[in-house]
Amino acid sequence: PNVVVTSDDPKAFAALSGYFDIIVTDVPCSGEGMFRKDLQAQEQWSEDNVALCASRQRRIIADVWPSLAPGGILIYSTCTFNVYENDGNVRWISEEMGAEPLMKDDLLAGMPGVIKTGLGYSLVPGLVEGEGQDCSALRKVSADPYVRSASGPARRRSRQETARKPES
């Protein structure tokens, strides 16, 4: 399979509409998973930083979403544990992008250090190798709900635009 690994600005993928079957995002976060090994991470943490990170994560997802093919899978991952950056953003992706969260109750059942959250899984530091992680999977169930124009930011499709069949 073809693989692209990048840390480019996600807007760089705008020309690749529907190109990818799977997109794995490890988005910048407030870094709560780093608290055990980095005292500075603890000192820099704040509710304002969590809000800033959650907003940044949504922009990243909104920018890459059009490049995910209908039926494609988005893996959303952070190294933090707060609900705003994890299940809160997964819920936002589901509601705003029309994505279907993919959860299997028995997928990771019984694995030490893995906790099922509302919409994903948390790997608990100290119980798994590494500093911990939160991960969710979502399926893109339809064509892009966002309309992009050269003159402005993305906007949500209207019901009329969504219902309209593409011209042949």
Language-model features and meaning:
Residues D21-A62, C79-N86:
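Mobile active-site "lid"/loop adjacent to the S-adenosyl-L-methionine
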Residues I23, G72, I93, S136:
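Residue-level signal for inorganic ion chemistry
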Residues D48, R56, D87-A109:
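Conserved Class I S-adenosyl-L-methionine
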Residues L68-P70:
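Helix-to-beta-strand junctions that scaffold the AdoMet/dcAdoMet cofactor pocket
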Residues I73-T78:
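Conserved beta-strand signature within the Rossmann-like core of class I S-adenosyl-L-methionine
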Residues P101-E129:
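Class I S-adenosyl-L-methionine
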Residues E131-D134, V141-S168:
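Polybasic, low-complexity RNA-engagement segments
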